[in-house]
Each structure stands twice: as structure tokens, then as C-alpha cells.
Amino acid sequence: MPTSTAAFPLIRAHLPLALALGAAALVAAAPARAMLHYEGIAYAADGKQVLYRESHWVREDGARLVLYQCTNGAAFARKRVDDGSAAPDFELVDARNGYREGVRRSGSGREMFSQAKGQAERRAPLPKSTEAQVIDAGFDAYLRQRWDSLGSGGPQRIAFVLPSELRTLDFRITPGPADAEVQRYTLSLAAWYGTLLPDLSVAYTRQDRRLREFRGVGNIRDARGRYPSVRIEFPERLRGQADAGAWEQALQQPLVAQCSAR
């Protein structure tokens, strides 16, 4: 949710649900069985312009590999998510600006880290929280786990981990409009300054609880280093199966330092 305000200077912080909505300790080899593969298309929030694409591979154990691709198909960033829990270790690397961030094991605990190109790595212990802690794509797992209680009760609060700021922010999840096919949820900051920031919204299919759309500030910076508002669609037609070879190819795929025109 990277919006700069005088009242809250660290609104560079963002909510990476775009998601599905990378990890240092990830096992590199994928199993031989087929795995889920799907794609997302990120549009500018105010129009039909395609900004980038996401290609997701999800193993049976919930581990996830994501390539972020230019409009010409070249990959510029990669994310590895350790497992399918609500608070997994992960690592995101963007070759365009040399930025990296994530959460990893450290000694007997865990730590957040981030690093801008040419700068020293910043790190801090993962803070404790009285709220349910959610990390990166773990938001998807959280929604699936709490689906029934979210639908029947009031808003729920989560502590979302923001490695870019080395802290957490409390968010409120509120069920939105629903119909026979789609359930929507709205995420807003659970603080007095929450009205200063735009809400995030996600839409899930009710039948199989599949993410269909994300609207809000994304987790991928633009050419100016800002986090733009995006609308990411996850079409059913771009959903299928892949084998272990596809995982390995995505893991070894070179990342470009600049997106060129088509």
C-alpha cells in the first residue's frame, strides 16, 4: 500500500497479495508429479493497459514459485514461497532495480529482510503479534482456512508482515458483496489513519475458493520505483497443470534488467 502521506510516512509499505493474491530455505527440486500452474494479468487500475503478467507454479505441499513477466514475455522478477501456510518464508528478487525482500529462518527464530541495489541488507526479527500473522501469499491460505468464519462473523484482524518496512501492519478483513458465484473481501488498515489509504479488494469463486481478481496497490514497482494501483485478473482459461520440468525451468529462467517494448 505504498502511498506517501504526511501523517504516515511508511505507506511505501505494500501488501503483496498480488499474490497469489520466494524463500531462502526452499527445496530446489520439485516432485515428479504434476502441479498447479496459473497466470495473472496485471492491468493499470484506471484502464485496460497491461503492466505485467504473473506466472505461478504451486506444488502439492503449497510451495510456490512465481515469475513476473514484461508484456513481451521476458521475466524480470522471481518469488519463491516456502510452503502453503498463512505465514511462510519467502524471497522476492526484482532484477530491474536489484531489490530483494523476504522472511527467512535465522538461528532459533525468523527475521524479515530487505535490500535495495548498492545498499546494505536491512533485517529485523519477525515481531510477535496478538493478531493472526500473515506473510505474503499466505493471505490466500488464511482466507481458505477462515472461509466459513469470515462468511458468518464480523470483520477479522490480521497482522500483515511488511519486510520492506521491517514491521507489521494490522489490517481488517471484511466480507463484501457476494453472489452465487463470487465472494468478495475488503482489506483496510485497522488504525485511525486507515482512511488515508485506499482499500484493497479480492474476489474469490465460491465453489472452489479460487482467487479471481485483486484490486489495490500491488507488490511490484514500476519504472519510477513506485507501487502502482493495479487490477490483476486470474482467468480460468490460464489455469492448468505443469510438471516438475516447468518448475525447474522457471527456477533457472534468466531475469532481465529492463522491460523492452513489444
PLM feature segments, named:
Residues 2-18:
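Bacterial N-terminal signal peptides that target proteins for export
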Residues 16, 144, 148, 152, ...:
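Generic surface-pattern signal
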Residues 23-29:
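N-terminal signal peptide c-region/cleavage motif recognized by signal peptidases
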Residues 30-41:
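Short, extreme N-terminal leader segments that mark the start of a protein/domain
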Residues 35-37, 46-64, 68-86, 91-98, ...:
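Acidic, serine/threonine-rich low-complexity disordered tracts
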Residues 97-126, 226:
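An exposed acidic His-Trp-rich patch
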Residues 117-165:
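Surface-exposed beta-loop interaction hotspot
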